[in-house]
């Protein structure tokens, strides 16, 4: 072919537009939501030379083969666990069903694959220092098995401290398993993992599928943060492993985040969630430990593990159920506020029912496009009667929901489409007034350090900023 021919450029543009039409049709047939399909199809049709490559990286939602493979792996894992008598939860599950507060969340028993269980102990861990002090102290006491899973692990001061601790426990004969997300931890050097492997730690990356093409996929990430030590103590929440989570990022410091420490029968659910992800990555089961006995009292907890391979959109349905069940208040904190139409409508309806609806979001951006889209949704929420606050001291990264007087949820799920439909997430639902009071006290402290967004803020926003926000919202279904 004569690349200098005057027709070559025209042929090339024609081919790109043809590929754009094919990709647009692909998006229409495969993207789960109408908003997402439109957000992809229109630019693919009109400006494919700008959107084809981003669609290959961020879109390509026909992951039916991937979803089928993930479900098959989960099935194989549970078959392998069948002989372990892994769910001796009858008494704890029956006790949980008697709770009136949990009964108000009528969809939860069927929404989660794991039951609500009684007789757990929970402890609120506010910010990075308290969280990692508790995690490191628990690992120090490990005797048998340590399970560690994070979306992000950095090879910095905190990451190296975790590495050395895990190496020391492995040298003592403890079985150590580490799982991290390949995209979230893209900056983690291979030498970090190799040092752990050489020291006897089993470490693997969570990837979507094998193959050259899929290495460019950034969807279907594993956003979960789980640590379980000897089946006796566990941790989940919003922190990853990096110095910024200790407030050492100058532009985002102080970092505001929340974790929860857990003991009791619900730890079996955390281990089961880890086992599913580990089995997907390795086709092997990690050791799973149940204590000989549980305490006779404690709080009700339910682990809500969600992901794109679920038969239904577990994460978004949880937010809907939590908001619809509220009779007095629903407070939500999230670093990203990009609700879909159903969740946004639920928030508006809650306001009309007289519920105290509050949303706490950051005042500083870590992703500018997401921040712009969040800002527009915040302005619209304020006009609908939702009280929206911006946390002032530093970057807010916690993911917390408080419903009425008894129900709270802390985990890894953000209030955005990525958590709703693309990421693997885990949230701990707790039904207990005393713990909810602690969460309320924590959030009240946050609100005192926040500035409430007003209708005037929207009117005072420059038109160019408003235009940027609206463009960001157009692509919000694919953010």
From Swiss-Prot:
- Stated EC number for the protein is 2.7.8.-
Q: Give the species this sequence originates from.
A: Pseudomonas putida (strain GB-1)
Catalyzed reactions: 2 a 1,2-diacyl-sn-glycero-3-phospho-(1'-sn-glycerol) = a cardiolipin + glycerol
Q: Name one GO molecular function term.
A: cardiolipin synthase activity
Which residues are named in the active-site annotation? 223, 225, 230, 397, 399, 404
What biological function has been recorded for the protein in this entry?
Catalyzes the reversible phosphatidyl group transfer from one phosphatidylglycerol molecule to another to form cardiolipin (CL) (diphosphatidylglycerol) and glycerol.
In terms of SMART domains, this protein maps to:
PLDc
GO terms for cellular component: plasma membrane
Q: Does the keyword Transmembrane apply?
A: yes
PANTHER family found in the cross-reference section: CARDIOLIPIN SYNTHASE, PHOSPHOLIPASE D
This one is known as Cardiolipin synthase A
Coiled-coil-forming residues are none
Q: Where is the PLD phosphodiesterase domain?
A: 218-245, 392-419
Membrane topology listed for this record = Multi-pass membrane protein
Q: Which family does it belong to?
A: Belongs to the phospholipase D family. Cardiolipin synthase subfamily. ClsA sub-subfamily.
Pfam families in UniProt: PLDc_2
Record keywords, A-Z:
Cell inner membrane, Cell membrane, Lipid biosynthesis, Lipid metabolism, Membrane, Phospholipid biosynthesis, Phospholipid metabolism, Repeat, Transferase, Transmembrane, Transmembrane helix
GO annotation, biological process: cardiolipin biosynthetic process
Q: Which residues cross the membrane?
A: 8-28, 38-58
Checking InterPro entries in the record gives: Cardiolipin_synthase, CL_synthase_A, PLD-like_dom, PLipase_D/transphosphatidylase
Compartmental location: Cell inner membrane
């Amino acid at each position: 072919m004569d690349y200098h021919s005057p027709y070559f450029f025209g042929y090339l543009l024609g081919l790109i537009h043809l590929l754009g039409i094919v990709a647009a049709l692909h998006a229409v047939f495969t993207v789960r939501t109408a908003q997402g399909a439109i957000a992809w199809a229109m630019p693919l049709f009109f400006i494919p030379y700008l959107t084809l490559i981003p669609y290959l990286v961020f879109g390509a939602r026909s992951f039916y083969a991937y979803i089928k493979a993930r479900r098959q792996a989960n099935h194989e894992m549970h078959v392998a666990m069948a002989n372990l008598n892994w769910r001796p939860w009858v008494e704890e599950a029956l006790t949980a069903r008697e709770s009136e507060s949990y009964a108000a969340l009528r969809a939860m028993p069927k929404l989660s694959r794991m039951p609500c269980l009684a007789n757990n102990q929970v402890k609120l861990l506010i910010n990075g220092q308290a969280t990692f002090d508790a995690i490191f102290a628990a690992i120090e006491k490990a005797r048998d098995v340590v399970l560690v899973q994070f979306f992000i692990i950095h090879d910095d001061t905190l990451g190296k401290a975790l590495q050395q601790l895990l190496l020391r426990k492995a040298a003592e004969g403890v079985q150590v398993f580490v799982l991290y997300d390949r995209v979230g931890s893209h900056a983690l050097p291979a030498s970090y993992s190799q040092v752990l492997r050489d020291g006897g730690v089993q470490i693997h990356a969570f990837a979507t599928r094998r193959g050259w093409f899929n290495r460019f996929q950034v969807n279907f990430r594993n956003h979960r943060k789980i640590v379980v030590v000897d089946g006796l103590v566990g941790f989940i929440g919003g922190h990853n492993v990096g110095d910024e989570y200790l407030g050492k990022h100058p532009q985002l410091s102080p970092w505001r985040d929340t974790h929860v420490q857990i003991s009791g029968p619900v730890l079996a659910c955390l281990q089961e969630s880890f086992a599913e992800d580990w089995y997907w990555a390795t086709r092997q089961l990690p050791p799973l430990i149940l204590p000989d006995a549980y305490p006779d009292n404690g709080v009700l907890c339910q682990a809500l593990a969600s992901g794109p391979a679920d038969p239904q959109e577990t994460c978004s349905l949880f937010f809907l159920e939590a908001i619809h069940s509220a009779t007095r208040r629903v407070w939500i904190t999230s670093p990203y506020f990009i609700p879909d139409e159903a969740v946004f409508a639920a928030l508006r309806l809650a306001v009309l029912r007289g519920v105290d609806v509050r949303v706490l979001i950051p005042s500083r951006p870590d992703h500018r496009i997401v921040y712009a889209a969040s800002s527009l949704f915040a302005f619209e929420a304020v006009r609908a009667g939702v009280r929206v606050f911006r946390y002032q001291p530093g970057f807010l990264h916690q993911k917390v929901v408080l419903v009425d007087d008894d129900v709270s949820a802390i985990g890894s799920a953000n209030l955005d489409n990525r958590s709703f439909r693309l990421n693997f997430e885990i949230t701990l639902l707790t039904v207990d007034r005393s713990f909810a009071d602690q969460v309320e006290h924590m959030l009240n402290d946050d609100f005192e350090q926040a500035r409430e967004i007003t209708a005037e803020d929207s009117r005072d926003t420059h038109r160019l900023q408003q235009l940027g926000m609206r463009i960001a919202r157009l692509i919000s279904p694919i953010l």
